[in-house]
Amino acid sequence: MVLSEHLLVLLGAVLCAPALSDVLFRCPPCSPERLAACPGNSPRSPCAELVRAPGCGCCPVCARLEGESCGVYTARCAGGLRCYPHPGSELPLQALVLGLGTCGKRRDAEYGSSQERGTELPEDQSDNMLVDNNLVAGPAVPGDFMPRKSSKAHAVNRERANEQHRSKTNKSEDKKRPARSLCQLQLDQVLERISGMHLPDDRGPLEHLYALPIPNCDKNGFFNLKQCKMSVNGQRGECWCVNPITGKVLPGSPTVRGDPECHLFYTNPEEERRAHTQRAP
């Protein structure tokens, strides 16, 4: 999965807030029905520590230990650990999204005495569970924190300012840029909606964000064959198959909470993409 720079900026604002009080979104409480649907009371193998499932999952899973891989969609690192991208990673946020981080000991000096802030919320406080996943996108600079009241808006405004600066200094290059694809245009619209969200005190349940249809574009701007909603309330998001050019659902393909095996319903992707590229201005 390839994410645009714009989406990574917003993911950073949501997932990598510098302090617990700055997190924008909180998971809703787990209902008795959701908890009862968990497969057994605990994972089969003994765990050093149990944590809540990734995202807003309700079922207990084994925490990742020091040195194990981690990311946005993996189980959280155990207490006292953080999920760090590999040193020198060019796209640290994307590495975390792809699960290419590594659990390591917290560097408290980088976070302004995290013990004073409270490193983790107990797992039984599910009513107020934070979607933190112990992620760190890169080395933090003391005092270089986003404003508390609008981290999301700050990230969006910063990206807009960068776009304006690039457009002013590279007008000749802008004229040569190819037209944005349909997938990229839809992604821009979703980001605009996110930047305009008004939640009480800039907080709210994750459904406000997860309910948005965020398109999954590849590195060339086409739709990825498989599109999925994010997991929420302990359930995996639904996945379906689309045409990479138009984004429309492929006829006969299923919508499932798993792998819809899109390759069975789309057999000539390269030919169609080449034809579309030749027709594009």
UniProtKB/Swiss-Prot annotation:
| Location of the motif Cell attachment site | 257-259
Q: What is its subcellular localisation?
A: Secreted
For the biological process aspect of GO, one term held by this record is: regulation of insulin-like growth factor receptor signaling pathway
As given in the record, the signal peptide range reads 1-21
All residue ranges annotated as the IGFBP N-terminal domain in the record: 23-106
Main subcellular localization, coarse class?
secreted
- List GO terms (cellular component aspect): extracellular region; extracellular space
Q: Where is the composition biased (Basic and acidic residues)?
A: 156-176
Query: Where are the disulfide bridges?
Result: 27-56, 30-58, 38-59, 47-62, 70-83, 77-103, 183-217, 228-239, 241-262
Gene3D superfamilies named in the record: 4.10.40.20, Thyroglobulin type-1 (4.10.800.10)
Report domain Thyroglobulin type-1 positions: 180-262
**Pfam families cross-referenced by the UniProt entry:** IGFBP, Thyroglobulin_1
UniProt keywords (A-Z) are: Developmental protein, Disulfide bond, Growth factor binding, Growth regulation, Secreted, Signal
Q: Name one GO molecular function term.
A: insulin-like growth factor I binding
The record ties this protein, via CDD domains, to: TY
Q: Which parts of this chain are annotated as the region Disordered?
A: 107-127, 139-180
What is this protein's function per UniProt? IGF-binding proteins prolong the half-life of the IGFs and have been shown to either inhibit or stimulate the growth promoting effects of the IGFs on cell culture. They alter the interaction of IGFs with their cell surface receptors.
Instruction: Summarize subunit and interaction data from the UniProt record for this chain.
Output: Interacts with igf1 and igf2.
- The name on file for this protein is Insulin-like growth factor-binding protein 2
